[in-house]
């Protein structure tokens, strides 16, 4: 939540990227005790949320959503009573919480596995906080040498409607915008998205002026 000029935080990133049009203040639940972060511990072990392998992980999943959404529902039910009803979690009044971020202890799994940073929307499992339904969420991992505040901003940008700009197919070197756009690569501190992306998906820019010869 830090918002000093040089602070590296998701709040400060969106403050600058939106030209002070968006405040991205986060609230942590369960509430910390002194300087200790308190976490929900699930009823299943970690390998239950890793891909199935007949030999190395027979308890693993074959359907990600069937494991992930019940997990997130239990986590929400665990913390729901901590969230004050005075906190506005649905600013557009559509009945859904604007966004929820789940931070999971430990390191990431393989690309696109359940234990990999992603944005998604819950379905098939209904979870509520103060009468508001959980829909769009970000899934983040606590520990990683690669994922930083940039990943927080990347996944939150998905929640705001921004698409990925990298190619999903392995074996290709195509990188449309490389390190020049948050939705294509990660840097620390996080780089901004392109002017077009901020105009098209963020609607933080009214128009893009055409710069021609002699302008």
Regions found by a protein language model. Give the residues of each.
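Extracellular hydrolytic enzyme modules, especially secreted metalloproteases
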Residues: 99, 105-215
């Amino acid at each position: 939540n830090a918002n000093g000029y040089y602070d590296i935080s998701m709040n400060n990133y969106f403050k600058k990227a939106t030209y002070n049009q968006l405040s991205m203040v986060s609230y942590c639940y369960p509430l910390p005790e002194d300087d200790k972060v308190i976490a929900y511990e699930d009823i299943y072990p970690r390998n239950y949320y890793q891909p199935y392998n007949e030999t190395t992980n027979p308890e693993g999943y074959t359907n990600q959503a069937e494991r992930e959404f019940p997990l997130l529902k239990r986590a929400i039910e665990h913390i729901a009573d901590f969230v004050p009803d005075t906190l506005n979690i649905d600013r557009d009044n559509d009945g859904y919480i604007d966004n929820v971020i789940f931070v999971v202890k430990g390191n990431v799994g393989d690309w696109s596995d359940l234990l990999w940073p992603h944005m998604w929307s819950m379905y098939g499992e209904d979870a509520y906080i103060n009468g508001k339904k959980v829909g769009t969420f970000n899934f983040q991992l606590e520990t990683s040498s690669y994922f930083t505040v940039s990943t927080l901003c990347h996944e939150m940008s998905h929640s705001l409607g921004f698409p990925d700009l990298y190619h999903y197919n392995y074996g290709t070197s195509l990188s449309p915008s490389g390190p020049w756009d948050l939705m294509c690569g990660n840097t620390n501190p996080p780089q901004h998205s392109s002017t077009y992306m901020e105009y098209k998906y963020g609607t933080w820019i009214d128009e893009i002026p055409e710069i021609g010869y002699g302008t």
